[in-house]
C-alpha cells in the first residue's frame, strides 16, 4: 500500500500540486487543533469505553445493560477502534472527527475553486462557501464533535450533493453514488438520522421525472453504492439489536423482549421520555421539571424551552449566523443585479421544513440535527440572494481567494 501510494503520489504530483498542498495543510492544522481542544463531554462517559471494548472483544451481547450510553452505538466508535495501534494505543481515538472535518474542508474548497475555474458560479457555489465558513467557525473544536457534529457536517455535504443532483440537466450516476454513500454514513453515525433517508424519495422523484418508471427504478437501484448504503443500514441496526434487542433505540415498537440480552420495553419507553424531556429543556444538571409526561406532551414545553434553551443557546447561534451573513454579504455585495430564475428546489425546501418541524417537535436540541437543518434552509435562500449580484469571474475570484 505504501509503495503504491508513493508511486502514484510521485507520478501525479505536478498535476495536483496545489490540491496536495491544501490537503496536507488542512490535516496539519486539524491534527494540532485536536491536541489543543478538550474532548467531548460524552467521551469519557461512553465514547471511549465503547471504542475500547471493541478493541478487546469481537462480539459482546447486551452491552446496553452495562451503560446507558452503550445503547446508542455509532460507526464513529467502530472507526475509533481501527486506530488502536501499537505504541499509539487509544490516543488516536479522535481521528474520525479529524477525517470528517478535514475531508469536508477539502471537498468544499475544491468545489469552489473548480466552479470559479469553469466560470460556473451559481447559488450552489455560494452555499458551499457559506457552509465552509460555518463549519470552521462553529465546529472548529474537533474534540467536542462527538457523534453529533460530525454527522451534521455530512448532512451539509448531503444537501450540497442533492442541490447538485437536482440542478443537473441529465441525471448522473456518479452524483447519485455520492448521495447514497453520504446517506449510509449519516445513518451509521446515529440511527435516528434514518429520518434523512427521506431524501431518497426526493432523488427518486427527480430520476422518474427524467426517465420512464421502469428505467428510472433500474437506474436508481443498480447504482454501485446502492448496496453499500443498505449494508450501512443493516450494520448500524444490527449493532443496536446486539446491544439492546432494539432495531432503533429508544423506539419501543422496534424492540424484541424475548432475547436474553434485550432491554425491557417499559425501560425503553421511560428512557425515550427522559431523552425527550432533556432535549425539551425539561431537565438539566441542577433542575428537573415536575410532571415530565405532561410537560413533554403537545407543546406544553415550549415556554420553558424558550426560557431555558432558546435564550441563550439558540439565540446566540442565530446571532452568529446573522453576523456571518452580514460579513459575507459585505464582501460580495454588488449594486448591479442580474435576473435569475428560481431553481427547482421547492421540493427540497419542503423536505427540509418537514425535518425542521420533526426536530422541533420531538428533540429540539441543536446537537440533534438542529444546526444542519436550520442553517441549510437559511443558506439556501441567502445563496439565491448572493447569486443575484452581478459579479464577473475576476471579481469573484479576487473576493473568494
Protein language model features and the residues they cover:
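Membrane-lumen/periplasm interface segments of specific transmembrane helices
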Residues: 35-38, 79, 206, 223-315
Amino acid at each position: 500500500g505504501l509503495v503504491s501510494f508513493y508511486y502514484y503520489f510521485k507520478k501525479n504530483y505536478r498535476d495536483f500540486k496545489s490540491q496536495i498542498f491544501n490537503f496536507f495543510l488542512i490535516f496539519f492544522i486539524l491534527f494540532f487543533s485536536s491536541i489543543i481542544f478538550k474532548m467531548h463531554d460524552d467521551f469519557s462517559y461512553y465514547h471511549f469505553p465503547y471504542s475500547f471494548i471493541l478493541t478487546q472483544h469481537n462480539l459482546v451481547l447486551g452491552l446496553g445493560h452495562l451503560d446507558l450510553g452503550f445503547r446508542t452505538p455509532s460507526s464513529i466508535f467502530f472507526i475509533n477502534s481501527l486506530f488502536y495501534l501499537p505504541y499509539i494505543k487509544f490516543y488516536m481515538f479522535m481521528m474520525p472527527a479529524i477525517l470528517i472535518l478535514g475531508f469536508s474542508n477539502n471537498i468544499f474548497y475544491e468545489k469552489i475553486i473548480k466552479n470559479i475555474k469553469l466560470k460556473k458560479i451559481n447559488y450552489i457555489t455560494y452555499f458551499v462557501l457559506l457552509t465552509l465558513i460555518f463549519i470552521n467557525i462553529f465546529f472548529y473544536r474537533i474534540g467536542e464533535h462527538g457523534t453529533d457534529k460530525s454527522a451534521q457536517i455530512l448532512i451539509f455535504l448531503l444537501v450540497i450533493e442533492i442541490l447538485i443532483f437536482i440542478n443537473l440537466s441529465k441525471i448522473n450516476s456518479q452524483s447519485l453514488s455520492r448521495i447514497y454513500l453520504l446517506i449510509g454514513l449519516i445513518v451509521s453515525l446515529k440511527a435516528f438520522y434514518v429520518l434523512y433517508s427521506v431524501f431518497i424519495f426526493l432523488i427518486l422523484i427527480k430520476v422518474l421525472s427524467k426517465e420512464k418508471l421502469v428505467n428510472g427504478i433500474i437506474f436508481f437501484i443498480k447504482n454501485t453504492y446502492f448496496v453499500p448504503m443498505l449494508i450501512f443500514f443493516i450494520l448500524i441496526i444490527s449493532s443496536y439489536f446486539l446491544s439492546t434487542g432494539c432495531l432503533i433505540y429508544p423506539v419501543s415498537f422496534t424492540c424484541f423482549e424475548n432475547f436474553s440480552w434485550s432491554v425491557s420495553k417499559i425501560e425503553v419507553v421511560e428512557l425515550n421520555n427522559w431523552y425527550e424531556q432533556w432535549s425539551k429543556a425539561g431537565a438539566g444538571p441542577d433542575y428537573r421539571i415536575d410532571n415530565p409526561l405532561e410537560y413533554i406532551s403537545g407543546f406544553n414545553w415550549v415556554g420553558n424551552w424558550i426560557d431555558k434553551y432558546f435564550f441563550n443557546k439558540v439565540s446566540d447561534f442565530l446571532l452568529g449566523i446573522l453576523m456571518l451573513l452580514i460579513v459575507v454579504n459585505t464582501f460580495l455585495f454588488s449594486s448591479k443585479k442580474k435576473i435569475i430564475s428560481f431553481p427547482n428546489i421547492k421540493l427540497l425546501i419542503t423536505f427540509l421544513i418537514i425535518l425542521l418541524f420533526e426536530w422541533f417537535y420531538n428533540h429540539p436540541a441543536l446537537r440533534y440535527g438542529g444546526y444542519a437543518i436550520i442553517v441549510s434552509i437559511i443558506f439556501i435562500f441567502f445563496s439565491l440572494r448572493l447569486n443575484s449580484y452581478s459579479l464577473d469571474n475576476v471579481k469573484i475570484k479576487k473576493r473568494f481567494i
